[in-house]
Amino acid sequence: LSGPDFLVHVGMLHGLDASVARERAHELLAALDLAEAGKKLISDYSAGMTKKIALAAALIHSPRVLVLDEPFEAVDPVSATNIRQILTDYTKRGGTVILSSHVMATVQQLCTHVAIIDKGRVLVAGTTDEVAQGGDLGERFTSLVGGVHSEEGLSWLGN
C-alpha cells in the first residue's frame, strides 16, 4: 500500500467517510513532509518515514488520547520539530498524549507530567518540574536509574 492509500483505509476503519479520510490523509502527509512520497509503497519507506506514517495513522481519526512509543526516534531534526508542533497543537485543542521516550530533554520540553520507570517499576511520577526537582530531567533520571559507568579501563581512548 502507498502512504495515502494506507491512511484512507485507516481513516475508514475508524468510521470516517472516504472523502473525509482522503482530505485528512492529504493534510497529514503535507504536515509530516510525506506528500512527495506519493504512491511509493510504505514497505519502501525509510525508518523515519515509517515513524511519520504511523503517527499520521494514529492521528487521522482525531482520537482524544494518543499513545506513542518513541515518536522522535529515527526522524530528522526538522521532522522532530514538526512532530513536536503537531503534538503541541493537538494537546492545546484538548487531546492527550502519552509517550515513551529515552530523550529526557524532549520529555522535559514537551510533557507536563512524567513517570520514570525502571525494570517495570515506577520510581517517581508527577509533574515534570516535580520529578526533575527543579533541575535537569536527564540528570534526575540518571540519578534514579543509575548505570553511569566510570571511564576506568578506557584510558587508551583518544591517545
Name these PLM-found stretches.
Residues 80-93:
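Helical segment within the ABC ATPase nucleotide-binding domain
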Residues 62:
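Conserved catalytic motifs of ABC-family nucleotide-binding domains
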Residues 66-70:
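Catalytic Walker B motif of ABC-type/P-loop ATPase nucleotide-binding domains
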Residues 8, 12, 19-37:
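Conserved ABC ATPase "signature" region
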Residues 107-109:
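A short, surface-exposed alpha-helical micro-motif characterized by mixed small hydrophobic
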Residues 125-126:
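ABC ATPase "signature
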